[in-house]
Amino acid sequence: TRIEGDAAFARWKAIAVLPTRFGEAVKSVRLFVPYGHLTAAQLRRVAQLAEWAGSLFVRLMATQDVLIPFVPEPLLPGFYMRLQEELGDVDLTFRSFKGHIVTCVGATVCKIGMADAPALADKLAEKLDLFLPADTAQKLALLRLVADEVRISGCPNACSGHPAVRVGIGCLNQNVAGEVRPFGRLLYGAGVTDGVPHLSTEGEGGKLMPVDALVDATVERLKVLAEL
């Protein structure tokens, strides 16, 4: 069909369609929810789409996304088209990095927060969106990495779980010439080594960096991890 030969559809399948224990006939589909926010109307449309595909329930993910557990493989083109037609007002297919970097709610909402973590994530997303053209293998590698292995916390409480992913940012305010400004540390390396799980350690010598430098350092680290 026309949609099956579409480059955007192929990119979406590569990043959002996941295997299940039922083999090739049944897939799971991940909806990438910007900032983890859906309106009531959007949520109803997601539920209707899941029901149309044969899923009687959906799962909420730790990444603030939604998983449709069961979608028959032949329905994937129709599922994608309905996403575009019925939920085109929200980027559930990860067209941009904006809104798809996991953060805490940040200082604009949290009473003990120090930095506006979502705003920092938007700065990082803007850089990443400019870095590679869409629909390339390299871009897909970066999408997968950012979707699951990057988190930002607006203070040392680490509400996003940033020490437990491969690239994490922990923010901390600093007094610079009498003005309070957001800084942060870049952490990386969480994983399993010789069967033993471990958290990330401080990168870049553990130094606190201002936001712009922090974003640049994070992009460079992601390029290394994604082998770009």
Describe the predicted segments one by one:
Residues 1-228:
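Peripheral terminal and linker regions in Fe-S/redox and tRNA-modifying enzymes
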